[in-house]
């Protein structure tokens, strides 16, 4: 009889096991506060399976192939979010199940609409700019008159030549670099005009002899170690590099600059794949992350700005008042976003980029 009751108990418990609630999250490396995941699991009973990627190409390839198994993903507005929206790879977000949506900054959400019309598929997670990480002391030692607040540090050959010995690094990202070069030349960052692109290629080729490295995430370590003195990279990467340099106490002083000529704004968004196996849990996760105290904890952890103004009350003062993380309005007026790039334009830019990297 006891065996019978035991078997019945196991049978009754089986559905509970089968119905365990989970959410599969796919995000950048080191891009969330572990406390947020812990609290979400405790408060909702939903288990988080968390995977990471190191490139947007990896994320996009998995989603376009279908059946990725992920419920929440974090595509950057351009170029990834716009392409995923166009290909139908993302599910519309049910805002009725995301009450925290009302706390998002409407001005910032408006900027994402060129990638996601109507903000149907993505909510801003974190944002920042593409600018310059600099080591002022090493730059001044080589070029005392070099403007530390200008893209001239990279794009003006006579200046780049002088600071070459301390190392110049730029992003290995044709869209980002070409858009910034267009802006530097006074053209539209989205221009596909042949004449504009020819001028960009001429500019890039003029500085090619002075570029030491093309890298993305590697700029953090290069800056922190003092292996490069100028790096075109993401704002948060420089903030992280500065923190590492300070911990190492080797005399490396770093600063992030959003140059006066203008810097590109980027937005990472929370989205749900159209074939997500747990869409309800995904909505619950997004709603939780966008709560002011939770997103503030994430900002404090990873040192990137968020789009929830009410979170300011919970952000560490040194982060909230760091112009490299939360730029003042006077700088924001010169910021720009890039729009979707056609397949033909992408191919043309890729060919130009290959010639630039090869130096011919």
Language model region names:
Residues 91-102, 152, 248-264, 273-276:
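Short beta-strand->loop
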Residues 221, 329-360:
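Conserved C-terminal helix/tail region of periplasmic/extracytoplasmic solute-binding proteins
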Residues 2-14:
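Bacterial N-terminal signal peptides
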Residues 69-73, 91-136:
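A structural signal for short loop-to-beta-strand junctions that line the ligand-binding cleft
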Residues 81-89, 116-147, 176-185, 265-271:
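Periplasmic solute-binding protein
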Residues 166-181, 185-255:
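Ligand-binding pocket segment of bilobal, Venus flytrap-like solute-binding proteins
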Residues 268, 273-333:
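Mature extracytoplasmic/periplasmic domains
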Residues 19-84:
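Early extracytoplasmic/lumenal segment of secretory-pathway proteins
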């Amino acid at each position: 009889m006891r065996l019978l009751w035991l078997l019945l108990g196991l049978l009754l418990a089986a559905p509970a096991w089968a119905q365990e609630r989970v959410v599969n999250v796919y995000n950048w490396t080191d891009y969330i506060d572990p406390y947020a995941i812990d609290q979400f699991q405790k408060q909702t009973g939903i288990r988080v399976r968390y995977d990471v990627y190191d490139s947007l190409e990896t994320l996009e390839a998995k989603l376009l192939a279908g059946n990725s198994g992920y419920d929440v993903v974090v595509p950057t507005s351009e170029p990834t979010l716009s392409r995923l929206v166009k290909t139908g790879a993302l599910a519309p977000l049910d805002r009725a199940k995301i009450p925290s949506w009302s706390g998002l900054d409407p001005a910032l959400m408006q900027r994402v609409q060129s990638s996601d019309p109507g903000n149907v598929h993505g909510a801003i997670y974190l944002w920042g700019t593409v600018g310059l990480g600099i080591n002022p002391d090493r730059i001044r030692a080589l070029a005392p008159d070099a403007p530390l607040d200008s893209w001239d540090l990279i794009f003006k050959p006579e200046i780049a030549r002088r600071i070459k010995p301390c190392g110049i690094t730029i992003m290995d990202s044709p869209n980002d670099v070409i858009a910034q070069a267009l802006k530097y030349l006074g053209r539209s960052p989205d221009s596909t005009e042949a004449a504009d692109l020819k001028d960009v290629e001429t500019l890039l080729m003029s500085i090619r002899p002075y570029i030491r490295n093309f890298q993305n995430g590697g700029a953090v370590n290069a800056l922190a170690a003092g292996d490069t003195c100028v790096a075109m990279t993401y704002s948060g990467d420089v903030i992280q590099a500065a923190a590492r340099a300070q911990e190492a106490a080797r005399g490396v002083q770093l600063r992030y600059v959003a140059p006066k000529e203008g810097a590109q704004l980027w937005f990472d968004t929370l989205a749900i794949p159209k074939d997500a196996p747990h869409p309800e849990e995904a909505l619950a996760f997004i709603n939780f992350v966008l709560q002011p105290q939770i997103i503030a904890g994430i900002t404090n952890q990873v040192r990137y700005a968020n789009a929830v103004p009410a979170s300011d009350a919970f952000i560490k003062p040194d982060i909230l008042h760091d112009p490299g993380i939360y730029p003042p309005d006077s700088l924001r007026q010169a910021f720009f976003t890039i729009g979707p790039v056609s397949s033909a334009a992408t191919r043309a830019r890729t060919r130009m980029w290959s010639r630039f990297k090869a130096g011919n």
